[in-house]
A protein has these predicted regions:
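Phosphate-handling DNA/RNA-contact segment within nucleic-acid enzymes
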Residues: 1-115
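Acidic beta-strand-to-loop metal/phosphate-binding motif
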Residues: 72, 118-131
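Short, surface-exposed amphipathic charged segments that create phosphate/polyanion-binding patches used
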Residues: 110-116, 155-171
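Switch/connector loops and helix/strand junctions flanking conserved nucleotide-binding motifs
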Residues: 129-132, 156-158
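Short, aromatic/basic amphipathic alpha-helical patches
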Residues: 131-142
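A charged alpha-helical hairpin associated with nucleic-acid processing machineries
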Residues: 144-151, 167-187
Length: 187
C-alpha cells in the first residue's frame, strides 16, 4: 500500500492508503480467493479513528483569506494529479482538496467558508453526474460554483493528459445550470 497522511490544522489526524496493484489485478485476485477462503485484498485502507466526512484531504493548502478558489475532487490521487498538472504547489489563490468520496458534508462546507473561499469548482469524476448535481446544490448558497466537465466519463484526473486538464479548465467549466442542461441534452 501507498500511505498518505491526512493533515488537519497542521496535525496528522489519520491516513488513507491505496494498494499498488491496478484495480483489475485486485479484482482478479479476489475472485480467485473467494472460493479458497483466503485473504481478500482491499483497494483502499483508511484509518478508522476519524470521521472522514468531517475532513478534507489537502485542507492545509487552503490559505485563510488567500485562497479564492478551491477545486473539490473525490480522492487523494485526484488532488495529487490536479496539483501536479495545474502546477498548484505554490499558488496561494487556488488549491485542490478531496472529500474522500462523492459527497460533501456541512462540516466540509464550513471548513471552506472559514478560510474565506469564494469559488468552488466541483471536479468529481465524469461518471458522478448525480453526485455533482447534489454537491452543486449544497454548495451554491455559500459559494460561486462551477463544474469541471470531464468529457470522458471513464477517465479520472490522473488518467488525463496535462493538455486535457488545462482544456477542461479553459473551455469546459460550466455553471450549475449549464451543467444540468448539458446532462439533460445528453440523455
Amino acid at each position: 500500500y501507498v500511505i498518505f497522511p491526512v493533515i488537519d490544522c497542521g496535525m496528522v489526524v489519520g491516513y488513507v492508503s491505496r494498494h499498488t496493484w491496478p484495480k483489475e489485478e485486485i479484482d482478479t485476485y479476489n475472485r480467485k480467493t473467494k472460493y479458497k477462503g483466503e485473504y481478500k485484498i482491499l483497494r483502499y485502507r483508511n484509518s478508522t479513528e476519524n470521521d472522514f466526512s468531517k475532513l478534507l484531504y489537502n485542507y492545509d493548502a487552503v490559505r485563510k483569506d488567500g485562497t479564492d478558489t478551491v477545486i473539490v475532487a473525490e480522492g487523494v490521487f485526484d488532488v495529487i494529479a490536479l496539483t501536479r498538472k495545474l502546477e498548484l504547489y505554490d499558488n496561494p489563490h487556488i488549491a485542490a482538496v478531496a472529500t474522500f468520496g462523492k459527497k460533501i458534508s456541512d462540516v466540509q462546507i464550513y471548513k471552506l467558508q472559514s478560510k474565506g473561499v469564494r469559488t468552488v469548482v466541483i471536479g468529481y469524476d465524469g461518471d458522478a453526474v448525480e453526485a455533482v448535481k447534489r454537491a452543486a446544490e449544497r454548495l451554491r448558497p455559500y459559494f460561486e460554483v462551477f463544474i469541471a466537465d470531464i468529457a470522458d466519463a471513464d477517465k479520472d484526473w490522473d488518467e488525463l493528459a496535462e493538455t486535457e486538464v488545462y482544456g477542461i479548465f479553459a473551455y469546459r467549466l460550466l455553471s450549475v445550470l449549464e451543467y444540468k442542461l448539458k446532462k439533460v441534452q445528453e440523455r
